Structure formats: structure tokens, C-alpha cells
Amino acid sequence: MPSLKALLRGVLVAAMLVAGSARAELNIEIVGGGASRHAIAVVPFKDEGPTQGNLTPVIRNDLALSGAFRLVDPSAVANVPFVPADVRYPLWQAAGAQSIAIGKVENAAGGQIKISFRLMDVSQQKQLTGGEFTVTPDRSRQVAHAIADLIYEAITGQKGFFNTRLAYVLKSGRSYALQISDVDGQRSQTILRSTEPIISPSWSPNGRYIAYVSFASQKPVVWVQDLATGQRRAVANFKGSNSAPAWSPDGSKLAVVLTTSGNSQIYIISADGGAARRLMYNGGIDTEPSFSPDGSMVYFVSDRSGNPQIYRVPVNGGDAQRVTWEGNYNVSPKLSPDGKTLVYIRRAAGNFRVMSQDLATNDTRLLSDGSYSERPSFAPNGRMVLYSSDAGGHSVLYAATADGSSKVKLAVLNGDVQDPAWGPFNNP
């Protein structure tokens, strides 16, 4: 079984060797689904189109991605309603739809468009939610995500996450690109491009900044970049290696891993940089810090027991407590937004899989298959887990429901993706 030092070397090697060309477009493919999904029909909106905004494909993709919905084909029903009065409920009930989303697009003053939508309960024949949005046509995609959020919340009772963003690193030839995109892969932006590895992107809690590690200085340095202005600053450039940035929940601090004392150890620094405070004193290797949602604890990986395991320690220092006990190789911890569930990577029988652990009961659940999965992170509502994994010779994005009931593949066409991170609700 490899040591934690070998694991750290492996992370660097993987960052330098992931190959393949990449495009920003994602292709959503349903690869598994639970039996209890809500059946919904999303009828094409009246007068939507390329210039007015193709809304329904975005809404359908969002709902499919969530794993909570089963899409009913509206073309099989002899009813195309745009307003509630036109819905013929018996036809939709016969088609197996539990709810139906309808809407229309109209021209508005100043070159804007007005998008109206309603979500109707088929059995009760009443409106569940709805809304109207007046925007410029180029904002129609964001409106479609907002509509999907409203539908998701009306059906599940949980806040939707479709207007959040993803960050990930793409490798094309000898070029690395740190990118952000919508949850469906559209509106992608390259934040940084380099011929040297870029790893470990981490979102600030307000969504304005991304911390990451760049090797452009011929060694790992932690940077923080303002997404609005593009300005960046080195916040950890100490002697030796600087890596694994993780934001505190209030955005004021970063946990980082430094080798200034020899072995990899966890330090706390200001988000603006400055002096580093060592969190613990341990003769082994400590790495991959992650704050608890309330900011009181730091979860991390250590080889102090002989093999890589996950521990937690108070943010102001103290005794570390071991968290994972099953298996002898557990890394990459991330906490759910409510602090009740931990996801991480376990190595078993030569395969690296995403695991979920209830922190109250210590019960575990397998969330991924494939031979090599990495870097799990929760959606901001805690209902989905994002990670990358191997598929067909490439590394692609997957999103699994937190209960393991369904999974979707978000394949970057003709490319490989690594180090994904799901952004927060309050994106700018």
C-alpha cells in the first residue's frame, strides 16, 4: 500500500501527465437513476428560439442533472399549452406526468424580452410556482437556470443549485487551463492558462475569488484570483512547497499545506497572505485541509497512523481525532453544507472510489464506480456530489446524488478534466 508521501507525489504526477484536447462544452448523460424520481414534462415555451433564448433545453438538462426528475416527452401528448387555462390535465396524467412546466417569451421595451413560466400540478390541477423575468436576450440562459431552481425547490423543498458554477482544470497538449462554467458546462471562462500544472482550485464562500496552486514559478505557489477583475496575488510563497488551499467559511482565512519545516504540515494564513500559523505539530505528513461549515474544525489527511486516514482538529489547535476507520487509504475530505456528512476518496482493491460517511453513525456509502475517482465536493445545497472519474479512456466530470440513488456524467467532449470544485450559492 503506498504511503502518503507517495500519494502526494502521485497528485503532482497526475497533474503533469493528464493528457488530451478539451473543449468547454459538457454533454450530460444519465448513467443511473433512482426509482422515486418526480415525473415532469417541460413544454417548449411559446416563441422561444435562438434570438429569444432556447429555454426548455436548459431547463430539461438542469432537472435531469439533479437526479430528482424523470422527464416526460411532451411531443407524445396532443396538448401544447403556454398558459394554465390551456392545460388538458387528463392527457398529461395519462402520459405519466406529475407536473408540467409551461411558459412563453414576449418582446418587451428597450430590446428586452419577458419570460413567463408556470409549474402546474397535474393531479391537483393547480399552480405550484411561477415567475416572470424581463431581461436582455443574452440573459435568457440565466433565467432558464433560475426557472429550474424554482421548479426544483417547489418539488423537493430544497434550494436549487442551477445558477451556481463549477471550477476545474483542463489539460490540452502542454497547456493547462483553469476554467469556470455554469453547472451544465456552458458560459465557460478560462481564468488562467499555463504550460505548468495548475491544481486544487478552491472557491471563496462569496464566489468572488478562487484560490489555486500554480507551478509557474517552478514550485507550487498558492494564488488567489479575483474573478471579476482577473487580478491575482500570491498568498503562500514560502520556502518549499505551498499547496492545498481551503477557505474558512467566513472567507477571512485559508488553510494551506507548507513544507517549510520539512514534512507537509497544515498552516492557517490570512486570505490576503501574510504570516502563517502552524495548526499542529506532528512528525508525519498532514495535508488536504478542509474547514467544517461552522469554521470550528479542520478536517485533513495524515499518515500518523501508518496509512492515509482522515482526522479533524479544532481550528485553534488541539488534539486531532481520527474520523475514518474503514479501509487503510482514505483521502480528499469534504464536508456537506450542514456538516453532517463527509465525502472522500477510498482506495480498495486498487480502485479509488468516492465514499460518503454519516458523521453521527459512521455509516458509509459508495457513490462512484470506475477505477480512479478524485476530488469530491458537495453542491451548495448538499444534495449532489461532484467529482472526476475515468470513463472510456478520459477523465470526466460526474455528479451523483448524495444518497447514491442516481448519477449523471458531465463529459467534456474530447478532453480530460481534473480537480473539480462546486461553487457556492452566492456567486456574483
Feature map (PLM): residue ranges:
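Sec/Tat signal peptide C-region and signal peptidase I cleavage site
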Residues: 20-24
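Structural motif
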Residues: 111-114, 174-179, 219-223, 263-267, ...
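Short beta-strand->alpha-helix linker/helix-N-cap micro-motif
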Residues: 30-90, 101-107
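Amphipathic beta-strand/beta-sheet edge segments enriched in Tyr/Trp
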Residues: 26, 84-150
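Multi-bladed beta-propeller domains
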Residues: 182-199, 225-243, 269-285, 313-329, ...
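Hydrophobic beta-strand positions that form the internal "hydrophobic ladder"
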Residues: 166, 207-210, 251-255, 295-298, ...
